[in-house]
Regions:
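An N-terminal, well-structured beta->alpha segment
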Residues: 1-4, 21
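Short beta->alpha junction loops
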Residues: 3-13
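Glycine/threonine-rich beta-strand-loop-alpha-helix active-site module
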Residues: 14-117
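Carboxylate- and glycine-rich phosphate/diphosphate-binding segment that chelates Mg2+/Mn2+
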Residues: 88-157
Length: 157
């Protein structure tokens, strides 16, 4: 078992490269992400780059992941991001000074283990932020306008 426990909030792009370099030497059969949304997004990005190589920025946008990645098991310890069930990983790109997304059905976890007991040790402030995040996602999903299917569209904003 190889443990990478240096995940930072909003997953800085360059930290993914450090994780992947360590993991490649280990040659894992699967990736398990345990933690909040950033930990799960890091796990998705690690599974992607271990499987397909290249640079993370090669996959920005939608449908650029060429095929299945290493199996991913997602174990959320906060409630709010929904990363354990979405086809999206969000990272911070210092060159763009913004968050960017990678979206592909190949990023969906093979299994999500959602145990509410794991959220019980979260600090109250983090629990409140995660709850607000969940509410924001729900409102956004309900009110968002439909958009075209152009895969480059997310990168044009």
């Amino acid at each position: 078992v190889l443990v990478h426990d240096r995940v930072q909030p909003d997953v800085p792009r360059d930290t993914v490269a450090v994780c992947v370099e360590e993991a490649r030497e280990f040659a894992p059969d699967m990736v398990i992400g345990i933690g909040g949304g950033s930990c799960l997004d890091m796990a998705k990005c690690a599974a992607l780059l271990i499987s397909h190589g290249g640079l993370l920025q090669d996959y920005y946008g939608e449908f650029k992941v060429p095929g299945p990645t290493l199996p991913l098991i997602a174990v959320p310890t906060t409630a709010g991001t929904g990363s354990e069930v979405t086809p999206v990983a969000v990272i911070s790109d210092p060159d763009r000074t913004m968050k960017v997304g990678i979206s592909s059905p190949h990023l969906i976890a093979a299994a999500a283990i959602c145990d509410p007991e794991l959220t019980m040790t979260c600090p109250p402030g983090l629990t409140a932020i995660a709850g607000a995040d969940a509410l924001t996602h729900a409102v956004e999903a309900f009110t968002a306008a439909r958009r075209g299917t152009d895969p480059g569209l997310p990168q044009q904003h």
